[in-house]
Curated annotation (Swiss-Prot):
Record-linked CDD domains: Orn (cd06135)
Gene field: orn
Pfam families given in the database record: RNase_T
Protein name as catalogued: Oligoribonuclease
One Gene Ontology term of the molecular function aspect: nucleic acid binding
HAMAP family given in the database record: Oligoribonuclease
Keyword entries, A-Z: Cytoplasm, Exonuclease, Hydrolase, Nuclease
InterPro entries: Exonuclease_RNaseT/DNA_pol3, Oligoribonuclease, RNaseH-like_sf, RNaseH_sf
Amino acid sequence: MRDELVWIDCEMTGLDLRSDLLIEIAVLVTDADLNILGDGLDVVIHAPDEALDAMIPVVTEMHTRSGLIEEVRASTVDLATAEEMVLDYIRGHVKQAKTAPLAGNSIATDRGFIARDMAKLDDYLHYRMIDVSSIKELCRRWYPRIYFGQPEKGLAHRALADIHESIRELKYYRQTAFVAPPGPSTSDIAAIAAELGPPGKDAADTDSAAGHTTG
């Protein structure tokens, strides 16, 4: 696997894979240290008026406020063209398919629409994903001060702006929640691994406790 990360964010008419449409996709590639490579790409995809008119009120308000609805109506780009544009950008930085993971916030939702509408793009990405929202949820449970102290997010609700927010958020967690490079010493790592024990140890302990009876 390569060190680059492919960051993608999508805007849709809703979250239902059975009926909603992908109307904007943006992409940035970063190196392992989250430095952005290139200018990135933001593509607005045309959708028919009936699809836009069918959006629920909160989504209509969001996309109206951001200006996306009018851009979608004016766009002449279809899904196939958008897919090729995104792939061309990614290939400029990631030469080999299936080597760079997809990164973003709640990225499984975006990947669902990518898999449905842009199979070649989905196939080019590694199957693994880096979801910043997972780190956020762990910080909420383990490091609440980090969670509540995170920088305020913008409310643009546009794909490229959302990617920049996600990269910024991961930089914050890297500096606050992760062990500073080069990480623990080899001896500390070995001690932690030994303390955790072999695979299945926790399950065996649970079974033993469940089977224990007192007289």
